[in-house]
Curated annotation (Swiss-Prot):
GO terms for biological process: 3,4-dihydroxybenzoate biosynthetic process; quinate catabolic process. Keywords: Lyase, Quinate metabolism. Pathway: Aromatic compound metabolism; 3,4-dihydroxybenzoate biosynthesis; 3,4-dihydroxybenzoate from 3-dehydroquinate: step 1/2. This is Catabolic 3-dehydroquinase 2. Pfam families: DHquinase_II (PF01220). It comes from the Eukaryota. GO terms for molecular function: 3-dehydroquinate dehydratase activity.
Amino acid sequence: MSRRLLLINGPNLNLLGTREPHIYGSTTLQDVETQAKTQAKELSASIDTFQANSEGAIVDRIHAARGEIDAIIINAGAYTHTSVAIRDALTGVDIPFVEIHITNVHTREAFRHHSFLCDKAEAVICGLGVFGYTAAIEYAAKHIKLRGKASRL
């Protein structure tokens, strides 16, 4: 059975392509999502995409993934550095996830160096630009060991 993936993008990622293109590049979120769907299909997987600027909406989407999704790819944006709620949601649903960042957060401002998610993630990808999404999707589709209900399929 094909893997069911969920790509979550957090606050301000809806502005990709126009927000600080010298940092984040000119690729739009729609471009990222279109490429993700094409890639997932090529890997015999399916992918749902979701973007929200509010923490609660992200938590709700993670909860809704329980029993339906095999792996999550998440770019939590600024919530990476602040959100215990997103961390708790990810650990609570027991779905393996890959944390992703377009930029190398470790070479940026000090407040971006800490992640509330990384110690629970299967993998962390940062600094590869939007290619990081490609790497994360391939990893999630091919290499993550499934857990819970998904692992019994």
